[in-house]
Structure formats: structure tokens, C-alpha cells
Amino acid sequence: MTSLPASLRDPAWNGRIATCIVAIVILWPMLTMAEFKPWILFDAQSLQATWQFLASFFPPAHSLEFLEMVAYSTWETIAMATAGMTLALLGAIPMTLIATERLSISRLGTGRIARWAMALRQLVRWLLILLRSVPELVWALLLVRIVGLGPTAGVIAIALTYCGMLGKVYADILESSDPAACDSLLRNGSGRLSAFLYGALPASASELVSYTVYRWECAIRGSVVMGFVGAGGLGQRMDESMKMLAGDELATMLLVFILLVACADGVSAMLRRRLE
């Protein structure tokens, strides 16, 4: 077997092979520790349980009383996600103004940021890290113990986690925007808020709104998941139906959930198109 001439050999071939070997060496112990055994899904007992579970879905529950309850829970889920996002925005916007170096007034004179401003900025950044490092499901689990069952825990949980996420990403977007307009306003005596509204925001509005809408879509999905720990909404009703082994009710709520996410995705796509 003749070897390829040097001019036809892929110079990155050895690197790709080495990368694959390293990835396998790292990934295999993780899969072993996670007890990843997908073949269990295909043994006789699992297949029988799967068939029985799916068979209980048909026909989906469609009584008027049940559909009214599902409609109310769906609206509660949307309200929970929207209220949580609104509170998150109220916290994220002022923290973004502090955390963004692009909006610093003290750096314009000497090129250095004042120590007190740097300390405050680092404090806010650490607060954003703290908020987003705890998933909303964990916040909901903790808050249910404090405020009790219901959507209040879900609203606060979304507000806390998404405040950290929005503040971090907003600051990154503003830092990567064109600094010319913002710097010009600050040098001519403009305040931080005015520089943000008339300098940084117009250049980054499309990206900021696009990410905000995406997070609202994520908040709707998260609201359903938080219902499983007692935070109300469609998820709590799904949890109750699963405990009662009511597959027909679960099927209806799954269909509603899929339609809800599809509608949220449609609204998100429409807003993005209007911003382009």
C-alpha cells in the first residue's frame, strides 16, 4: 500500500486524532460515573413499561371542566414567566449600568477607573454571578418553604436567576458595541444613564431585545418545570396527574405545553424579524 505524497496529506490529521483520543479518555470515566446505560431502555421490562405508559395517554382528557382548569394553569404559567422577567429586568438594568466599564465616567480623564468605582463594579459583578449560579428550580425549591405553594415562589425564582443572566449578558453586549457615540456623550458632560439611552442602546438594541425575548421563552419553559416543586402553573397540575397515574390528563397538558412553547417561539421570531 503506497502512502500519500506529503503535499496531499492533511497537516491537521495528527492533531485531530490526538484530540479524539483525549476526548475519549476524558469522556469515558464521566459516562461510567454517570451510570450511562442506554441499552436498559431496550430490555423487555423497560419496553413493556414504556408501552403501558404511552397507552395510558389515549384518548387525551377533554372534558370541559378539565380543559378550563388547564387553560387557567396555562395562563398562570405565562403570567409567572412574564412577571418574573419584568422583575428581573428591573434589577438587571441598573446593575448593567454599574457593571459596564464602557459607561464609566471616571476612566475618560486619566484612562483609569476610580478605585471606588472599580470596587462597586466588582461587587455588582459578583452579585450577578451569585444570582445566576443558582438555577431557578433550586430558588423555587427554597422559596416554596418560605412563601408556600403557588406561583409567588416561581415569580421570585425567575426574577433572581434571570436578573443575574440578563445583567451579565447585557453588560457583555454593551462592552462589545461601538464606543464612539457613548464616549462622545460622556466627554460632553452626559450622565451614565443618558450615555446608555442615546449612545450605547441604539447600537445594541436589536441584540438586547433578541436576547430578552429568548430569555422570556426560556422563562415559560422554566415556569412549567418549577411547577413540579410546588410553584404553581401547568407544571404543578402535570405533577398531580403523574402521581395519580392519569395518563390521559398528562397527554392533554403535554400537548398544551408544546403549543405554548411553539407560540412563544413564534412571538420571539416575529419580534426578531421586526427588529432586523
Task: Give a label for each model feature.
Residues 142-145, 149-200, 206-215, 266:
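Membrane-cytosol interface at the C-terminal ends of specific transmembrane alpha-helices
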Residues 210, 251-276:
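C-terminal transmembrane helix and the adjacent membrane-cytosol boundary/short C-terminal tail
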Residues 81, 85-93, 97, 137, ...:
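Hydrophobic positions within alpha-helical transmembrane segments of bacterial inner-membrane proteins
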Residues 145, 221-257, 276:
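Glycine-rich helix-loop "coupling/hinge" segments at transmembrane-helix boundaries
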Residues 63, 117-157:
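Generic hydrophobic transmembrane alpha-helix motif, especially the helices
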Residues 71-79, 121-131, 213, 217, ...:
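Alpha-helical membrane-interface segments at transmembrane helix boundaries
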